[in-house]
């Protein structure tokens, strides 16, 4: 992205897309968007520098904000504002940035900041796209107009994200034009200079058979032209999650049974919809990127491939629900128990968005791959039954066993 967009465009990784990439993103990206206490805890354990964190989220818990503000308050000298609050003097970590999605969040940030001796908090005011997130234009204008009511906050920028999987470049251009108009209005009506814009473009990732491939370089070059056309010349940060993470992940599942019911071939795999999640997939009607890996028959797994030459299979998971269908009518000639299916382009969200606790099935193991280091196990397969047991003592014993 940097090669096409230029080094002046900052890249923020939305870690909700895949938290297992946090350490790598901390090294490669300019920052990370963090939306919960749990995500913040992952960042701190990974050693993510505080100045790389943008604390976002529609629900900011008071205890969590106090924790982050406290961490930020001891990271540098007090009293910086203006350009210094945005960039920080050389060698001094600046405070984390915070998004504000409501007046109550602003009050919370102001209250927490007033109790520390740290820097004024960098705040990005989130503009709504017509839903529960962010605030409308008039509210944002009113906040900036009354900025003296927030002496411990510095409104450095705007944040805007309207959704994912945008196929039309024209929609992104229109959003940038609207943002540019609002920034110009703030400048002209309030004589206030917004210094940074955090924008989530929601670039499209083709997941399914029949979708047109995306020329990513051309798409990014077109996006750069749209940015250059803006009157706004401050700092621009792009929030990207799916676009970065989706191509980086694959899910491997094994065929454990095959059968034929009323002329339809079914294969059962050891995963299911609790592990596999593609945005836009509905009732297994679309075929995602799948590879078929024939495998020698596993011991103790007799081949019960149904008779007949039909190679079209409906792939179902291990959950006891008719909704656990991954793909319908998938061509798999010669399929047998023990074979494996690899679902590609699944690095975003599937690792966390699955209905993992349903039926108390195990969580899948997670491995990372690097060219030099090869495969590395970062999480083994984990039981979910302790979460569903109903016994507090049993759950606590399991936690102690995992974390002695």
Where are these regions (language model features)?
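Acidic/histidine-enriched ion/cofactor-binding microenvironments in catalytic or ligand-binding pockets
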Residues: 192-194, 214-231, 327-342
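Glycine-rich beta-strand-to-loop/alpha-helix junction loops that act as flexible
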Residues: 161-164, 197-204, 240-243
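Conserved active-site and cofactor/substrate-binding residues in soluble primary-metabolism enzymes
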Residues: 20, 104, 138, 170, ...
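Active-site-proximal beta-alpha core segment in soluble small-molecule metabolic enzymes
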Residues: 8-196, 222, 226
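An N-cap/entry alpha-helix motif that binds or orients negatively charged groups
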Residues: 1-6
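Short glycine/threonine-rich loop-to-helix capping motif typified by GTGT followed
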Residues: 168-174, 206-219, 246-257, 328-331
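Active-site flanking residues adjacent to catalytic metal/cofactor-binding acidic residues
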Residues: 100, 125, 201, 238, ...
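Charged (often Lys/Glu-rich) extended helix/loop segments that serve as interaction or gating elements
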Residues: 235-404
């Amino acid at each position: 992205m940097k090669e096409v967009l230029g080094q002046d465009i900052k890249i923020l990784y939305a870690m909700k897309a895949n938290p297992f990439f946090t350490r790598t993103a901390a090294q490669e990206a300019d920052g990370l968007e963090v939306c919960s206490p749990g995500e913040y805890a992952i960042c701190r354990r990974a050693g993510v520098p505080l100045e790389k964190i943008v604390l976002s989220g529609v629900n900011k818990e008071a205890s969590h904000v106090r924790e982050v503000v406290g961490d930020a308050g001891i990271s540098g000298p007090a009293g910086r504002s203006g350009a210094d609050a945005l960039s920080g003097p050389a060698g001094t970590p600046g405070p984390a940035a915070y998004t504000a999605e409501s007046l109550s969040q602003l009050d919370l940030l102001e209250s927490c900041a007033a109790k520390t001796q740290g820097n004024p908090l960098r705040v990005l005011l989130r503009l709504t796209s017509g839903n529960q997130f962010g605030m409308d234009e008039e509210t944002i204008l009113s906040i900036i107009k009354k900025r003296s009511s927030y002496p411990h906050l510095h409104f450095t920028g705007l944040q805007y994200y309207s959704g994912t999987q945008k196929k039309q470049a024209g929609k992104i251009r229109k959003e940038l034009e609207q943002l540019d108009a609002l920034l110009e209005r703030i400048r002209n009506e309030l004589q206030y200079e917004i210094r940074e814009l955090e924008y989530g473009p929601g670039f499209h990732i083709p997941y399914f058979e029949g979708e047109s491939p995306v020329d990513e370089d051309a798409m990014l070059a077109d996006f750069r032209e749209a940015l250059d056309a803006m009157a706004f010349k401050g700092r621009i940060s792009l929030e990207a999650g799916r676009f970065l993470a989706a191509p980086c992940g694959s899910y491997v599942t094994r065929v454990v049974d095959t059968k034929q019911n009323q002329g339809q071939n079914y294969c059962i795999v050891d995963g299911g919809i609790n592990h596999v999640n593609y945005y836009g997939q509905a009732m297994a009607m679309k075929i995602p990127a799948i590879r078929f890996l024939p495998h020698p028959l596993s011991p103790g797994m007799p081949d019960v491939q149904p008779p007949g030459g039909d190679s079209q299979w409906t792939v179902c998971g291990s959950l006891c629900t008719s909704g656990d269908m991954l793909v319908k009518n998938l061509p798999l000639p010669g399929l047998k128990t023990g074979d494996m299916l690899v679902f590609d382009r699944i690095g975003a969200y599937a690792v966390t968005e699955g209905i993992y606790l349903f039926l108390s099935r195990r969580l899948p193991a997670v491995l990372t791959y690097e060219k030099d280091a090869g495969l590395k196990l970062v999480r083994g397969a984990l039981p979910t039954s302790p979460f569903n047991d109903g016994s507090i003592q049993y759950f606590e014993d399991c936690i102690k066993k995992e974390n002695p």
